[in-house]
Amino acid sequence: SAIRDFLISKGVGSWRLFTIFPVGRAASDPAMLLSSDQFRQVMEFIKDTRQQGKIKASYGCEGFLGDYEAMVRDRFFSCNAGITVGSVLCDGSISACPSIRPDFHQGNIYQDDFMDVWTNRFDRYRQREWMRTGPCANCKVFRYCRGNGMHLRNEDGQLLMCHWRKLRNQPIDAVVTEPTGT
């Protein structure tokens, strides 16, 4: 709350908060990642900060949060990487988002026409059914999260972290099936 109060005292109007996801150093150092209880505390902090109305706090585009969605964001979660967001990285790589690993790059502006890449590639981003594997195979909230953010997938496309399960203190491989007929 000291950081929040400092930002308010400086007249900052908006504050977007993120958490660390298990990539890079955080992949091999569990101390860098929040526990389920700590993650819920962050959501409660953002919710309380929003209710106070002194600064517009919101949670980043990390993943689907279930019941917290409307309390910590202005919009329902959607990973728009490769759908409405495209990026050109410093090396010329054409990606959807700078947080997404190189395995998902779609081209390079030094060899490819950006609009051609945008129009004719990015299928992996736009057609999400391939994500219905592993913990997402029969998950009851897949229709809302669509397999989570692309940056939360490893080089093989496997999910590294599920925010919805983390908030429920469930391991990523817990079976949370969707009722049949829905």
Predicted regions and their residues:
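Radical SAM enzyme [4Fe-4S]-AdoMet core and its adjacent flexible, acidic
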Residues: 1-85, 90-95, 99-105
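Flexible mid-to-C-terminal extensions adjoining Fe-S/redox cofactors in radical SAM and related proteins
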Residues: 99-182
